Amino acid sequence: MMILSIIATVVLLGALFYHRVSLFLSSLILLAWTAALGVAGLWSIWLLVPLAIILVPFNLTPMRKSMISAPVFRGFRKVMPPMSRTEKEAIDAGTTWWEGDLFQGKPDWKKLHNYPQPQLTAEEQAFLDGPVEEACRMANDFQITHELADLPPELWAYLKEHRFFAMIIKKEYGGLEFSAYVQSRVLQKLSGVSGILAITVGVPNSLGPGELLQHYGTEEQKNHYLPRLARGQEIPCFALTSPEAGSDAGAIPDTGVVCMGEWQGQQVLGMRLTWNKRYITLAPIATVLGLAFKLSDPDRLLGGEEELGITCALIPTSTPGVEIGRRHFPLNVPFQNGPTRGNDIFVPIDYIIGGPKMAGQGWRMLVECLSVGRGITLPSNSTGGVKSVALATGAYAHIRRQFKISIGKMEGIEEPLARIAGNAYVMDAAASLITYGIMLGEKPAVLSAIVKYHCTHRGQQSIIDAMDITGGKGIMLGESNFLARAYQGAPIAITVEGANILTRSMMIFGQGAIRCHPYVLEEMAAAQNNDVNAFDKLLFKHIGHVGSNTVRSFWLGLTRGLTSHTPTGDATKRYYQHLNRLSANLALLSDVSMAVLGGSLKRRERISTRLGDVLSQLYLASAVLKRYDDEGRHEADLPLVHWGVQDALYRAEQAMDDLLQNFPNRVVAGLLTAMIFPTGRHYLAPSDKLDHAVAKILQVPNATRSRIGRGQYLTPAEHNPVGLLEEALRDVIAADPIHQRICKELGKNLPFTRLDELARNALAKGLIDKDEAAILAKAEESRLRSINVDDFEPEALATKPVKLPEKVRKVEAA
């Protein structure tokens, strides 16, 4: 009985941690339990004395603080990693949303499913069906990329007339004031037609003068610039990146010095600016330049510090000395992008966005706005491109035949085709879910980094898969190619607004560990403020948090999550239970990693990368489950749901295993392995059978396939190869049963070629009627158009000689 009572006590202790019972109530329960066992004669009643001696100090705050919290507090202050001003502002900026739940070890799935699904207003739907549809029709991507290296003038004029650059600007200033959700839908539709078109529209609606002015501008600045930006009268750009500082924006060498100077014939307070920027989208044609620089005030003319820090200003590009106009040439996707320079240019102090009081506040402004822009523009552009590519590649795989069968039926093709379909579904779920948070007023910095990285990365991988499937069709450039420019341009999205290597290895977990953790950020604040009282309360909440996640990790690993709560009992039930387990695992691994490695975790990028991967996969899986629920839980969509969640579970478990295999403290790694994998690893990548079901969805018209491509431009217009492939798919499917019937009548397995000739012969023999012959002829026309590629006269591929800038000759010393 003694052994059973000990086991029961351990189970009770575990249950208290598992359910996160408060310290005081847990202490009372343990004392009562010990007393009951003593009365029953199983334990000595005198055990209450040592137990009380242990528990009382934990529950008496002054004693607990002096004996435990104060020494820990002193040690914590010593090991707390140093944090630069820019890092602190990045962490302090923005908010935590659903990713915070995932990080805490016990996600509230009911809360996730209660987030309202955005609905398009009549105005927003009309914009998508009208101006956006027309802009897609006007865009000829081959002409844009090969002939013009720019949007045609009539398309530029159309975008300005219909206020495409004003989706984020409020109606009071003449803007459209669209929701984040509809902005995402617009960009997805445009990117399925032309990457240049989507980038051109997306950037002014992301991080730029419009966004910064609305949040921080003075009334005078807003009233002057916002109506002009809304009308397209002003073209904005924002210059942050320098040759010497790409991802490390805090190291920008561009400078401004507060001083007095002459402006329009008068002596005014202003700044002398010097900058050298590159990679600035819209800079070559911009009329107003948003500029980030480090501002100093050596004479303290503003009355504050000498070194004010990063500041943002708006500079009309007509200002004498501002250099714009030259262009970069990014991977044959020539959107307007180029350098800008200025040397010792004097401008009034009122050019600072928000006026002089916002001097030195630029980095906070940028980070707060960047989390919104990064969460919409780049993920939406990548997602829209992959959605269109998924439909087109699926159609091509059905239409294209080798060895008398559609190539889409070959297992070698099914594997990458399933990845394309699965990624399109997952990416759209992830890109949509973050817009829900933004519309609720959140500025999710960590989540925007997750979505930016995974949508652009999966987008690139999906484009590579599509190129493997389409072969020569994807390689040969021309108006009928739906893939090559997306393939060429994929690294652009990977690189901009936080290069993906940096985003994955430093930003996702680097910010997530502090911002998403329920206690660490407040503990750091308490340490910085030398507040032992606040630290004491947080410390014991933190200890309970670690204990809870240790118990939850072990128990959910032992039972494979079978006992954990789920919001549904259908085919997705087990996924919620698996995610409950992984969430507890992540919380435990994060706390132990921070405790063992301390400040060095910041430099252990491969460890933080893997922890960030787990958090990311938890988000992607939950986004898939949220999408499935929002769309009505269609059973036909389950193959995509299974693929998306199983892929995420497998990748998350792999990341944890890799982390434990490489954890520097091997003793701790062994203990963690026992806690997290008590019965070993269990999750598998999507099976061949599931890949087959997913790949099949893309190859025939159906409701699930339509949901994959929802909102894309699929009109079979002259310059829309995706729409023409959709039309061809319908034509070929309509012809297929007629072709099979002819084969049966003739007793031959005829190839699915020369259908027009076959139609004439079959009609002459009375095997088909005129309508069926017309269907076969139409299918042959569409089939040939789909599999053929463009060719050109040799001179059509030549370009004009590029005029290089003259090199300045060095003057030799005498």
Swiss-Prot record:
Pathway field: Lipid metabolism; fatty acid beta-oxidation
Coiled coil: none
Presence of keyword Lipid metabolism: yes
Range of residues in the leader sequence: none
Cofactor entry: FAD
Domain of life, source organism: Bacteria
An annotated Gene Ontology molecular function: medium-chain fatty acyl-CoA dehydrogenase activity
One of the GO biological process terms: fatty acid beta-oxidation using acyl-CoA dehydrogenase
Top-rank EC class of the record's enzyme: oxidoreductase
Any Gene Ontology CC annotation: cytoplasm
Enzyme Commission number: 1.3.8.7, 1.3.8.8
InterPro entries xrefs: Acyl-CoA_dehydrogenase, Acyl-CoA_Oxase/DH_mid-dom, Acyl-CoA_Oxase/DH_mid-dom_sf, AcylCo_DH-like_C, AcylCo_DH/oxidase_C, AcylCoA_DH/ox_N, AcylCoA_DH/ox_N_sf, AcylCoA_DH/oxidase_NM_dom_sf
Keyword entries, A-Z: FAD, Fatty acid metabolism, Flavoprotein, Lipid metabolism, Oxidoreductase
Residues the record marks as active site: 497
Catalytic activity entry: a medium-chain 2,3-saturated fatty acyl-CoA + oxidized [electron-transfer flavoprotein] + H(+) = a medium-chain (2E)-enoyl-CoA + reduced [electron-transfer flavoprotein]; a long-chain 2,3-saturated fatty acyl-CoA + oxidized [electron-transfer flavoprotein] + H(+) = a long-chain (2E)-enoyl-CoA + reduced [electron-transfer flavoprotein]
PANTHER family assigned: ACYL-COENZYME A DEHYDROGENASE (PTHR48083:SF18), MEDIUM-CHAIN SPECIFIC ACYL-COA DEHYDROGENASE, MITOCHONDRIAL-RELATED (PTHR48083)
Function as written in the Swiss-Prot or TrEMBL entry: Catalyzes the dehydrogenation of acyl-coenzymes A (acyl-CoAs) to 2-enoyl-CoAs, the first step of the beta-oxidation cycle of fatty acid degradation. Is required for the utilization of medium- and long-chain fatty acids as sole carbon sources for growth. Is needed for bacterial survival during carbone-source starvation.
Family affiliation: Belongs to the acyl-CoA dehydrogenase family.
Name this polypeptide is given: Acyl-coenzyme A dehydrogenase
